[in-house]
């Protein structure tokens, strides 16, 4: 989108950051009892308990947001996201095991009325020859079948926060920029094991088409070694994988087949308390890998990374997180560019390493089931290695800090339209 606000080097940038951070702290000072996972609170709530059989409902799901990314340096560009995502849809359940949803999904950014008319995977490149006016609109359809411990989904998937991908593999901001995931999904949940497998079909091609077929296959598994009991301890082993494939038998481009993947295995320890101030603490450690099975999109075929993180839930309203990341020859498919060793700002350039310290403070206050207000401030302190450009020149290693701040309001009221006999 050509109307995105790009952050530049202005003398007042530090003052802006301090003002936003002070405003954020003042806001959370009046926090009241709430759930603390902001990403999950802002995602559509897939609660089926309140759905009566043979009853037609209207869900008016909306997320209003304003997010400012003050980025500097040669890793990625800064930008601002002001807008709303609106997904009104009908919901009907003919039987306890079946559920159908039908509607539309619209993404609207303030300050523009033209949108590139193709699949949104992130901040997209403007193509003025094919665009939609008013909003980026897609049809919405979901069919859900529940069979014992398994749930099968066709159409619009339970994506985003539902996958529970770790931060280096998936950035929450995708909720504000990418198209809803569509395809097929299987979820299984037992007492000791939880699995989510999906295929997100992102780009369909016709005969003689001028772009590539693209889809992502993902799987997350979580083994519960220790579940919360009397003393509130839990210990999990999460295994996660995402694979993106581009190409297709109908592909008439000269780009060739490209298959890229990320994977991780880790350990997560969590302790909860029934207290007013300290509610929960969490530690996590994950080993990650990146693999280019086909294609030459990356200048390397394998890479690795290590992620360690800690979090505190406070006052039933705040979450404070810190993390440390170090990587070599690693590219994340859907995570933040500050975990990459490729530059998204300098074409074809790569870093010899990427060490990143991460921090975030989140505040969320739900108003019943249907509404939630949230705010988040976070930063990346990067110790990037030497930057190697395509022309053979290099930039010295540098220590930089990138800052981001956002406010959000989710509304998902449900209206009963008709009961059928």
PLM features: what roles do these ranges have?
Residues 164-168, 297-300, 304, 315-383:
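Outer membrane beta-barrel transmembrane domains
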Residues 151-222:
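Surface-exposed coil loops of outer-membrane beta-barrel proteins
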Residues 63-85, 115:
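Surface-exposed strand-loop-strand hairpins of Gram-negative outer-membrane beta-barrel proteins
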Residues 86-92, 139-145, 184-188, 219-223, ...:
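Residues on the lipid-exposed face of transmembrane beta-strands in outer-membrane beta-barrel proteins
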Residues 58-66, 102-106, 154-158, 197-201, ...:
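Transmembrane beta-barrel strands of outer-membrane/channel proteins
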Residues 399-421:
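Outer-membrane beta-barrel "beta-signal"
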Residues 33-56, 92-100, 146-149, 192, ...:
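Short loop/turn motifs that connect adjacent beta-strands in outer-membrane beta-barrel proteins
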Residues 78-86, 133-139, 178-182, 211-217, ...:
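Residues that define the transmembrane beta-barrel architecture of outer-membrane proteins
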């Amino acid at each position: 989108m050509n109307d995105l606000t790009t952050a530049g080097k202005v003398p007042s940038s530090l003052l802006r950051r301090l003002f936003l951070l002070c405003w954020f702290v003042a806001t959370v000072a009046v926090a009241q009892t709430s759930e603390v996972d902001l990403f999950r609170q802002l995602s559509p709530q897939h609660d089926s308990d309140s759905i009566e059989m043979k009853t037609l409902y209207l869900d008016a799901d909306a997320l209003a947001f304003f997010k400012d990314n003050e980025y500097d340096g040669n890793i990625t560009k800064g930008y601002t996201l002001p807008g709303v995502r609106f997904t009104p849809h009908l919901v009907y359940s003919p039987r306890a095991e079946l559920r159908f949803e039908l509607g539309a999904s619209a993404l609207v950014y303030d300050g523009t009325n033209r949108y590139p008319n193709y699949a949104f995977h992130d901040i997209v490149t403007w193509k003025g020859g094919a665009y939609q006016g008013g909003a980026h609109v897609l049809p919405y359809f979901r069919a859900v079948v529940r069979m014992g411990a398994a749930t099968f989904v066709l159409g619009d998937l339970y994506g985003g926060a539902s996958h529970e991908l770790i931060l280096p593999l998936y950035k929450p901001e995708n909720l504000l920029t990418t198209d809803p995931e569509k395809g097929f999904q299987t979820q299984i949940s037992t007492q000791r094991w939880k699995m989510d497998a999906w295929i997100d079909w992102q780009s369909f091609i016709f005969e003689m088409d001028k772009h590539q077929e693209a889809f992502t296959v993902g799987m997350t598994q979580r083994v519960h070694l220790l579940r919360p009991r009397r003393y509130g301890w839990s210990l999990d082993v999460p295994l996660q994988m995402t694979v993106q494939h581009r190409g297709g038998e109908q592909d008439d481009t000269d780009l060739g087949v490209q298959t890229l993947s990320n994977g991780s295995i880790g350990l997560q320890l969590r302790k909860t308390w029934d207290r007013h101030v300290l509610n929960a603490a969490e530690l996590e450690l994950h080993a990650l890998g990146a693999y280019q099975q086909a294609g030459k999109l990356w200048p390397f075929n394998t890479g690795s990374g290590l992620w360690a993180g800690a979090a505190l839930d406070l006052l039933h309203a705040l979450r404070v997180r810190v993390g440390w990341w170090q990587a070599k020859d690693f590219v994340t498919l859907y995570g933040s560019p500050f975990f990459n060793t490729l530059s998204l700002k300098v074409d074809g350039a790569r870093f010899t390493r990427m060490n990143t310290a991460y921090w975030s403070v989140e505040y969320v206050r739900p108003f019943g089931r249907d509404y939630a207000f949230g705010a988040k401030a976070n930063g990346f302190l990067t110790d990037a290695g030497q930057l190697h450009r395509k022309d053979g020149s290099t930039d010295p290693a540098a220590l930089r800090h990138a800052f981001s701040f956002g406010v959000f309001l989710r509304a998902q009221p449900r209206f009963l339209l008709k009961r059928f006999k």
